[in-house]
């Protein structure tokens, strides 16, 4: 059960350590676009951002809002924030932990980790341009899935696709992949957990031009350390790669969304693994690539300060093939570091673009990043702001 008193480390269960293999860069500057406040404001942002055609940013927070059950917020280009919707609890959702999907009509779609029914298994919701919320589906936590922790994908027909972290087979409750029709009917496309299949999908889905879906699971696979998978139009699943940290260099526990290039290569991060001599011998995590044939390459392994530790939210890809992401901890503060924003180039060279201090600039970024046309990066930090009132920040990193 998520509560506001839980520490960021408990939320991710990340083994922290010092980091020393990166190339620090301090030419980039951070701007705090907004600091969340106590009271009825949104609080504790745990996910990334989406933007509309005029540059407004939208996101979710785990807590805050009128009922302290989480909120959806809008931040305009002038830095003015507005709570678009406050979750009520009960039949409504509680604690949205994923980023939103914004359609051309200005409707926002997302998930909550809790609420919806007595099962407390979460919901899929829609918020229209006026701020009116509609619960599209309430999970039961049974065969349909439960506790969705990831963002949604929407097709041209208005169907929504996503992952549920739990539910599915009664013997495992290892999660599902689901589809929600515009009318709110749910179809389970795949149930995780049998044999060497993946288990516990934390990240969302991406699609190719043939409507194949790709994603990751935190556990399961041939070695119990997570998988990269593909689901075709018929619902048939293929395990593209099973992580094997036992080989001493591979990653473990992929927990974020994937990125895909024009050649069909998939890129992502693992929460642990890589250099087994770091982070209490669990490894501080990796950035990886999986080619269309299922061959994996570790592009970068996080080590000791100041490169960060625990990259949990995946990466975004620019036109030059550079990858950008966040680490939830590490940096110059060592085991108690407040996280970093990083870049990995096509040759596997990592650059720390920014390291958080945990003060007014924010700390513990769990989010995936949003990149604009000129290379500015936008994201959220789970904590930070004035000590008395700060409940996390929205930030911009300028290249």
Residue ranges and their predicted role:
Residues 2-399:
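Extracellular beta-propeller repeat domains
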């Amino acid at each position: 059960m998520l509560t506001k008193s839980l520490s960021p480390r408990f939320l991710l269960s990340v083994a922290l350590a010092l980091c020393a293999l990166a190339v620090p860069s301090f030419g980039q500057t951070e701007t705090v676009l907004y600091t969340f406040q106590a009271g009825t404001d949104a609080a504790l942002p745990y996910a990334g951002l989406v933007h509309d055609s005029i540059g407004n940013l939208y996101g979710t927070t785990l807590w805050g809002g009128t009922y302290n059950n989480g909120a959806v917020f809008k931040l305009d280009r002038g830095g003015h924030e507005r709570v678009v919707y406050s979750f009520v609890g009960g039949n409504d959702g509680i604690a949205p932990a994923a980023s939103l999907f914004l359609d051309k009509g200005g409707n926002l779609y997302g998930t909550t980790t809790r609420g919806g029914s007595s099962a407390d298994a979460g919901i899929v919701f829609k918020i229209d341009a006026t701020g009116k919320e509609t619960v599209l589906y309430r999970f039961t936590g049974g065969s349909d899935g439960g506790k969705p922790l990831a963002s949604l994908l929407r097709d041209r027909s208005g169907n929504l696709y996503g992952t549920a972290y739990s539910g599915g087979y009664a013997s495992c409750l290892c999660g599902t992949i689901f589809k929600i029709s515009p009318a709110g009917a749910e179809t389970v496309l795949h149930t995780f957990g049998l044999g060497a299949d993946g288990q516990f999908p934390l990240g969302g889905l991406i699609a190719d031009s043939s409507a194949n879906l790709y994603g990751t699971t935190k556990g399961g696979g041939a070695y119990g350390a997570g998988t990269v998978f593909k689901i075709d139009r018929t619902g048939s699943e293929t395990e593209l790669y099973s992580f094997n940290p036992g080989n001493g260099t591979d990653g473990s526990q992929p927990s974020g969304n994937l990125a895909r290039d024009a050649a069909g290569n998939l890129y992502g991060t693992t929460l642990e693994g890589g250099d087994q001599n770091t982070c209490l011998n669990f490894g501080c995590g990796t950035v990886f690539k999986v080619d269309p044939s299922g061959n994996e390459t570790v592009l970068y392994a996080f080590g000791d300060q100041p490169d960060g530790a625990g990259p949990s939210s995946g990466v975004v890809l620019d036109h030059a093939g550079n990858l950008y992401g966040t680490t939830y901890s590490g940096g110059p503060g060592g085991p108690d570091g407040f996280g970093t924003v990083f870049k990995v180039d096509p040759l596997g060279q990592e650059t720390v673009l920014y390291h958080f201090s945990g003060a007014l600039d924010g700390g513990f970024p769990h989010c995936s990043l949003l990149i604009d046309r000129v290379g500015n990066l936008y994201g959220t930090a789970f904590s930070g702001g004035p000590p008395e009132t700060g409940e996390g920040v929205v930030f911009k990193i300028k290249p």
